[in-house]
Amino acid sequence: MVKLLVIKQLYNLSDDQVEYQALDRMTFQRFLGLTSSSRIPDAKTFWAFQQTLMNAGAAPAIAQAVQQQLAVAGYIARNGQLIDATIIRAPVQHFTQAEKEVLDRGEIPADGSPAKRAQKDLDARWTKKHGKSYFGYKAHASADVRYKLVRKLAVTDAAVHDTNHFEDLLDETNTSREVSADKGYVDGEREQRLTAAGWRVKVQRKAQRGKTLSACQKGRNTRIAKVRARVEHVFAGLCQMGGQQVRTIGLARVFLQPLAEGEVSFYSLV
């Protein structure tokens, strides 16, 4: 069943399409270890399996198992790590003013039937990036420099600032203590704390209002950018897999959808 998840994420398929393609394609059947006479789970069974994984919070365990397989194959995290975040767009929700006020307080609207509430994404939030508004979630990822494989991930609503999960993403298994990030992660106090703990933090500097960066700071930013750009390759690969938008509802299900821990693991395997 986990291999069906791989197919779903790799080809960005719906549950019904997963069932059809598994029945129709011999290549998929060989990957699944099935024969033409084997029983293939239908779409409802596959949906129930995903629901079970979601309720059990099993996505991190699957991601950890993939990391162990990568390590056994020799893909050990090396040469430092790169931390960045990307937005996962979700279908825009339409709420009444009263519902918006309840959501702003961090509560869940009580009116309406359970079926109606199930069709409302109460976890996604609005954010702005480069002057443009986005609705959805945000994936915070840490990738190693050597292989550009995602090692740690956190998924939040889009309104959460990138820096909130910086320390949560630090990979202790990496052979290097160097960590690089863009200017959105500037935090002098945290950098001092991590440096004291043995980390070599390389965060690009941001010019203060009314001032410009010195030639030394610009040169430092350029050197960091050459290394940090490798993490953009990771997000570009996930984007090709349909990982920057979701068709599911709720943060819990996003963990089994594009750019969540399941797909990040599958990207690493690919």
Each model region followed by its residue ranges:
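Residue-level detector of short, conserved catalytic/binding motifs and their immediate flanks
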Residues: V2, D16, A139
